[in-house]
């Protein structure tokens, strides 16, 4: 012990950092100098199993738990505000929850850089929220620290700055796959992702997209809500995409940027979700701006009838009806969620009449439950009309029944 006593304080603290806190506390009783040094140990490893033995009676365990909590309180009080690198805590039992919160706050205030917690509680425990905050790290710095990142998922993120217009930039030269779903409290968003190949973007439309670089995009699934903002800059950034999906809300948001809609020169497959409460205002210009489109997938045909969708569908009778379809090079048309209404049948006939390159049409029909039989038989008129279309057209029309 005399040899150890001759060592400098810094070296003794380093040696003590390899001991558990219980072992360091036991050594500290050897002398006043050792007791003072424990205040500067940079690592704390605290385990209740060092003190609590489960074979003892419950009454004794409760007393020992109190001793354990008092021990941790004394160690933290002895250390005061000294810097701390690592804090490891392993404990169990619901009686610790309030005290644990104070311990975590203590080490967080002291700037702990590594927190190792293993805790079991009888009831739910909400951890001190500042554990998950880092005031020195922002999102852009975080991405720059990941130069080889290829996939990023941002799912239901709530930005802290609720009272300001927050701008977030997804900037990564290596990123290939990006999934974004519901990022709350943002005003603008930028994409600087030149290597991005796949984008799944489901969120509220932003007020602006100051930077939007995705020139190598291969596939995109876009689902944007609230038709109040012009997303033309975002659309222009994905103009090189080959496979594209638009949700029902996105199609209506696109109606705000029809005049600035880019030409999707590489697009081969376009999928669009439709619903009766949303219009097709953007459909005519969208089809005209896909000069090499081969496959068109319409998930449902019924939509809200407006004056501006008339030349893409059979909803409105006018002389220029079908004008946007006549230049559309689509060869394969898939119609999903077909309900068998006469309105849908008229639209199918409309596509057969005005899509000049159409070679194959696949109609998916789901059987519905019936009150008298297990399934309702497909109305004979639908089968007859499909057969009639096959005779009058060069297009192969298929009715696929499922359910």
Curated annotation (Swiss-Prot):
**Transmembrane ranges?**
none
Q: Where are the LRR repeats?
A: 64-91, 93-119, 131-156, 175-203, 243-274, 275-300
- Keywords linked to the UniProt accession: Leucine-rich repeat, Repeat
Q: Which residues form the F-box domain?
A: 1-47
Recorded superkingdom: Eukaryota
Annotated disulfide bonds: none
Q: Per the record's keyword annotation, is Repeat included, yes or no?
A: yes
Annotated InterPro entries: F-box-like_dom_sf, F-box_AtFBL13-like, F-box_dom, FBD, FBL60-like, LRR_dom_sf
Q: Does the keyword Repeat apply?
A: yes
Task: Give the matching PANTHER family.
Answer: F-BOX_RNI SUPERFAMILY PROTEIN, RNI-LIKE SUPERFAMILY PROTEIN
Protein name from the UniProt record:
Putative F-box/LRR-repeat protein At5g38386
Q: Specify the taxonomic lineage.
A: Eukaryota, Viridiplantae, Streptophyta, Embryophyta, Tracheophyta
């Amino acid at each position: 012990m005399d040899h150890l006593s001759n060592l400098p304080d810094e070296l003794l603290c380093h040696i003590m950092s390899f001991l558990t806190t219980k072992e360091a506390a036991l050594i500290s009783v050897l002398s006043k100098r050792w007791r003072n040094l424990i205040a500067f140990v940079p690592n704390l490893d605290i385990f209740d199993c060092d003190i609590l033995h489960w074979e003892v009676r419950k009454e004794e365990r409760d007393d020992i738990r109190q001793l354990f909590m008092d021990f941790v309180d004394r160690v933290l009080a002895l250390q005061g505000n000294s810097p701390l690198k690592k804090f490891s805590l392993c404990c169990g039992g619901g009686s610790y929850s309030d005290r644990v919160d104070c311990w975590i706050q203590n080490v967080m205030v002291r700037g702990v850089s590594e927190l190792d917690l293993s805790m079991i509680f009888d009831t739910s425990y909400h951890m001190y929220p500042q554990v998950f905050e880092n005031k020195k790290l922002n999102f852009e710095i975080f991405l720059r620290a990941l130069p080889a990142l290829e996939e990023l998922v941002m799912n239901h993120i709530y930005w802290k700055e609720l009272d300001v217009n927050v701008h977030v930039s997804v900037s990564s030269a290596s990123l290939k796959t990006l999934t974004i779903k519901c990022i709350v409290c943002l005003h603008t968003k930028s994409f600087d992702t030149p290597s991005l190949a796949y984008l799944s973007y489901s969120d509220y439309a932003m007020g602006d997209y100051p930077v939007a670089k995705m020139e190598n995009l291969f596939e995109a699934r876009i689902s944007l809500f609230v038709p109040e903002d012009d997303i033309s800059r975002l659309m222009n950034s994905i103009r090189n995409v080959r496979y594209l999906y638009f949700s029902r809300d996105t199609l209506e948001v696109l109606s705000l940027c029809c005049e600035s809609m880019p030409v999707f020169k590489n697009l081969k497959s376009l999928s669009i979700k439709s619903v009766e409460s949303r219009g097709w205002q953007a459909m005519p210009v969208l089809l005209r701006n896909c000069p090499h489109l081969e496959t068109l997938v319409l998930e449902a045909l019924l939509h809200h009838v407006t004056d501006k969708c008339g030349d893409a569908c059979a909803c409105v009778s006018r002389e220029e009806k079908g004008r946007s379809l006549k230049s559309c090079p689509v060869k394969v048309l898939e119609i999903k969620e077909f309900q068998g209404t006469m309105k849908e049948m008229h639209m199918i006939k409309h596509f057969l009449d005005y899509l000049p390159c159409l070679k194959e049409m696949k109609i998916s029909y789901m059987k519905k439950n019936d009150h008298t039989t297990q399934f309702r038989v497909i109305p004979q008129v639908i089968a007859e009309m499909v057969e009639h279309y096959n005779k009058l057209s060069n297009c192969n029309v298929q009715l696929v029944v499922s359910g």
